[in-house]
Structures are given as structure tokens and as C-alpha cells.
Amino acid sequence: MKVEIYTDGACKGNPGPGGWGVLLRYNGREKTLHGGEAQTTNNRMELMAAIKGLEALKRPCEVDLYTDSQYLQQGMKEWIKTWKRNGWRNSKKELVKNAELWKSLDNLASIHNIHWHWVKGHSGHLENDLVDALANLGIEELS
């Protein structure tokens, strides 16, 4: 099955209250997801959005995943292979930040054939604007 996933994370303060939003599109249908955490960072919320989107898939899929986070897109397309090879350490020999989320995302990604796409945030991209609103709703619902 072919699926489009749009993801976004948001944070009020960094760290601070954060939220994530997801839009899944498949077979002419759409499903939205969102949530939040009281104390987090924007990067953690970007990762959580991708994790939650992939967790929603019931079987292996052909996925086009769209994000406005270069951290997420480059992490999955470029950096993760080196991190794994180096025992989850970066080029400075420091432990990779958010390693537990990267590991979870890597495990989920291994189930699917994923094409990672970067889109410019806050630029009138309809789906990106929607998941941004969902991420902010995740923050609002914390209070």
C-alpha cells in the first residue's frame, strides 16, 4: 500500500511544552493524529511525529514522508548509518541526542520503504500548515 505521511513538531520554549502532528493519506482517505509532552524540545517532537505516523501503519507500506525538519530528514537519510556504526556517537564522539527516539524511528523505518522529503515550513504548503496546526493543538491540549 502507498501512503503519504506529513509530520511536524512544535515547542513553546525549547525546552518547554511541545506537540506533534501527523497527516496520513492513503487510498483516498485521510487520518490525523496529534499529541504533546509537558517538557520537551522541538527536535524530540519532530521525531515523535514521524514515529507516531509510522506506528499507525498496520503493515509494510511504500511511504512518502514529508517533514519541514532538516534534522529529521538528514538524520534518516545521512547521519543514522554513521551513528549506528559508531555506537550512537556523533562526529565529536559524543552520544547522539535523542538516541532512544532515533532507534525507535530506525526500527519502524526498517519495516517500510520510505522516501524522505523536506518541505519548507510556514510557506503556504497546505499539508505542512495542517500538521503544524495539529502540533500546536497538541500543546494547547496539555493545559
Curated annotation (Swiss-Prot):
Its main location: cytoplasm. Keywords: Cytoplasm, Endonuclease, Hydrolase, Magnesium, Metal-binding, Nuclease. CDD domains: RNase_HI_prokaryote_like. One of its GO terms (cellular component) is cytoplasm. Binds 1 Mg(2+) ion per subunit. May bind a second metal ion at a regulatory site, or after substrate binding. It is an enzyme of class 3 (hydrolase). NCBIfam families: PRK00203.1. Belongs to the RNase H family. This is Ribonuclease H. It comes from Legionella pneumophila subsp. pneumophila (strain Philadelphia 1 / ATCC 33152 / DSM 7513).
